[in-house]
Amino acid sequence: MRTVHRIDPDGVPSQREPGDIDRAHGNGLVATGLRHAYGQLTVLDLDTFTVAPGDRHAVIGPNGAGKSTLLNLLAGTTRTQAGTITYNGQAITRRGPAWRARAGIGRTFQHPRVYPNLTVLDCVRMGGWHHRHQPERTPLEALDLVGLIGYADYPAAALSHGHRRMLDLAVALAGQPRVLLLDEPVAGLTDTDTTRLLDILGRLPGWMAVVLVEHHMEVVAALADWTTVLHHGRRHTDGPTDTVRADPAVTALYLGTGGDDAAHR
């Protein structure tokens, strides 16, 4: 199977602790002092959030904790009200989503966005529009990776919810991101589709950073090395995923008192 991505000349980033930015070279995505409010309601108040090349970083928390707001601010789909965001040492706080996509920050959406009047292949081509010299094989490789190569000429509107999720991922991958932001990628998927998606995400290149907003703890455990817990827009705790999952305070806050059964809610 062909791969969507290629290692560029500087090679694979060296190993580091999750969330530890290579500050000597300014590599990574760094948000500082982010604060966002809707009217009088503050939905996010975060001191720092860092993503280094190759990180697998989950963001969890109850509904309304500010998870999707954080992702939208990182992607540029929501304008930053307060705070700064840098990417590889460059200030991007005022840059919009198209600029960030060109720079290497891709994303999927909580509700998959497709162009219903386009074919599946044309939707993926749209995902890589900012790469002016992108070879035709890149959209095809993205479809191949997510298992939709046989649907390339289908109208996007004809896809099932599960296939739309895969298409949303293919669109993001066609942009050849360095940082991939995933907003509840398994929401509404069957167990079979969830397993398939986990396999796909597990085969992404090691240099690609993944930030995952997710409610399903078994998905978080499978994908993320590092987990940040948000509550009322603030950082409740963070650390290695296994440690966070075992924290009784996190269980009480997020999983409830139902133990392992609650992890599937």
Spans of features found by a protein language model:
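Glycine-rich phosphate-binding loops of nucleotide-dependent enzymes
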Residues: 2-265
